[in-house]
Amino acid sequence: MTPPAAMNRPAAMTPFAALHHRPGRPLLLPNAWDHASAAALAAAGHPAIGTTSLGVAAAAGLPDGAAATRAETVRLARRLGRDGFLLSVDAESGFSDDPEEVAALAVELAEAGAVGINLEDGRPDGTLAPSAVHAAKVAAVKAAVPELFVNARTDAYWCGTEGPEPEAVRRLDAYQRAGADGVFVPGLGDPAVIARLVDGLSVPLNILWSPGGPGLAELAGLGVARVSLGSLLYRSALAAAVETAAAVASGRPVGPVPGYAEVRALSGS
């Protein structure tokens, strides 16, 4: 990759985009799956909140990565877009390989109040979509909604490709040239590779936090601009629910939890 001037701050920038251009202070983006989880995270002081496609799909009893979750994704965006935080929506692959259909989805999300969208090149069958197809989606979305922050994700480290670094570099270059505002590489935890990607990109790099991987401070030092939590919070909530039930069943004490009134307040009631 040959960047023009890596991480230069554009003259005009949305508040959400600006959170990606704070050297040494990456945006920590927690991911919600419903209104209550998003409201709780906003109340805790997070200025921007993403959605998790796995959490949204699983909470609705739907498979992650399937076109059936499109309606749930839009429905949740319409609810969350009315709140006071900056909302970025995990739109999977755009639920279509037709760039114009993906652009139409982006328009719906922007009209709902979303300021960012995540688009991934991984497919439900574990393969990668052709990079040209994904780049066309990115370009179509930017043409339709220029102010929407497009975070183009490659699943090169998740889809079993041989030599994932060269494949990721090739794809990220195609996506930033198509107009992506940022790029995302989940599954990457090697500090040396992260540093090389940051050096070669002209747009902010997003990394998925993972247990055993680099911490927030180390990622900041590597030049990462955004750190996402993905489905971690949803999976943690499931684990906490099961553990709490087990504690009650075995007579063990239960840890502190929000009160009834606190939860009601999250919905404004």
Where are the model-predicted features located?
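A general boundary/transition motif marking the beginning of the first structured unit of a protein
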Residues: 4, 129, 254-255
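Actinobacteria-biased recognition of intrinsically disordered, low-complexity terminal regions
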Residues: 1-13, 269
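Extended, intrinsically disordered, low-complexity segments
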Residues: 231-269
